[in-house]
Amino acid sequence: MYGRGSGAEHSRGSGAEHFWDPRPEASSTVSSSLRPPSGARDLLPREVQRREKLEAQLTRVFRRHGYQRIITPTLERLETLLAGGSIRAESVLQLRDGEGTMLGLRPEFTASIVRAAATRLAGGPLPLRLYYHGSVFRNSRREEGSYSSQEFFQSGVELIGAGGWLADAEILLLLADCIRSVGISSCEFSWTLLLGDVSLTESLLSAVAPTAQAAVRRAIAQLDYVYLESAPLPEAARQIGLQILGLRGQPGSVLSDLAQLPVPPERLRDLRQLCQVLEEHGVRVVLDLSLLQTLAYYTGIVFQAVASGEIIALGGRYDRLYALYSPQQVEQPGIGFTLLPDTLLRLLPPDPQTEEMGCKRLVVPLVPAGIPAALALAARWREECTAPLTRTEAVELELLDRAPEEIEAYARQCRIPEIAWVQADGSYHITHPG
């Protein structure tokens, strides 16, 4: 899923960590052939540990709501990824296989998951509740017109086979649960749900002359009041564009304004019920009819979660996408969201537990004859770990035959609290490096 762009610069709201800190000049002295390509980066152990913890927190929430994990290919047929023209071909990193078939690295998850649902999972019980974690890859257009490739990590869910405002509510309350679980709600800043409805916005735009629709829609998506006020547009198109930009604020006020406009009454009723449920569950909602996601497959509600001026999640309803992948052109409603872990980790405060990178113990054979006993001791301590294994419960073995003072310096540098010194007869004593 895309938002208005892929980052905070399109938000409606206002450094990698390392196991050891490298020297500041290191990156500038490394040959370009030894660095990852532009838009990609290495994730070093401490950052991986934070990311894994975040993923585990989200997984618990997803499963608590009845969602099961799905893993789709990183590489797909290009036609699958384009989702019937909803995704621009130039935004996909493309390659050709040995048979000449055009392939691409997925730029988002929804198309691949809906493809799997419409083929491999067709005929099964509905609704399908699926979640995912993984990387997506995009060509992003620079201001001068060239493209740069970028890799992002995403976590999210897709609910397929359930339409209506209640399914919308499930997804949005699940999103709120995810945000609470990772600790955003307990930070100094709060988060806000920006909620729009493509069907209502398109209903209003239908009165705009076809020749002006693209320009008005683009101005709305970019919040470009200046263009709408000054461009040579038909006056009716200008007024409708400005009217849509004004439909933003507290749900009660916006819903009252919408009730005076030519929009489908059943959609207005559903949106009112949805906003009421969200309010009852403590979700801060800003209703925004100018919220137009960049993907053409959205058909109903669209939304962004914003914290501290940055988009942390986005999604929407896509009721016509399933039929594109169904061999029988069967239609099934769908809705989902994706969270942006890179942004979440940047906003969340450092976790003291993940700062403690060191393993629990370092086992050192003092003499070669003590190696069998050291191996046995390390194995026994590992087997005694009853909690889910993390690095802080791990047991390392000394491999480099270093002097005791060098071993202690290593333990201090790696924050290892205990060293077990093993004798030839299997006896050992423990020290605690300062």
Swiss-Prot record:
Any GO BP annotation: histidyl-tRNA aminoacylation
Region (Disordered): 1-48
CDD domains associated with the record: HisRS-like_core
Location within or outside the cell: Cytoplasm
PROSITE patterns according to UniProt: AA_TRNA_LIGASE_II
InterPro entries named among the record's database cross-references: aa-tRNA-synth_II, aa-tRNA-synth_II/BPL/LPL, HisRS-like_core, HisRS/HisZ, HisZ
A Pfam family matched in the record: tRNA-synt_His
Keywords: Amino-acid biosynthesis, Cytoplasm, Histidine biosynthesis
Keyword Amino-acid biosynthesis tagged: yes
Biased segments, Low complexity type: 27-38
Pathway involvement of the protein, from the record: Amino-acid biosynthesis; L-histidine biosynthesis; L-histidine from 5-phospho-alpha-D-ribose 1-diphosphate: step 1/9
Keyword Transcription regulation on entry: no
Annotated Gene Ontology cellular component terms: cytoplasm
Family to which the UniProt record says this protein belongs: Belongs to the class-II aminoacyl-tRNA synthetase family. HisZ subfamily.
Function per UniProt: Required for the first step of histidine biosynthesis. May allow the feedback regulation of ATP phosphoribosyltransferase activity by histidine.
Note: This function is generally fulfilled by the C-terminal part of HisG, which is missing in some bacteria such as this one.
Record NCBIfam families: hisZ_biosyn_reg, PRK12292.2-3
Quaternary structure annotation from Swiss-Prot or TrEMBL: Heteromultimer composed of HisG and HisZ subunits.
Cited HAMAP family: HisZ
Name this polypeptide is given: ATP phosphoribosyltransferase regulatory subunit
Lineage, top ranks: Bacteria, Bacillati, Cyanobacteriota, Cyanophyceae, Synechococcales
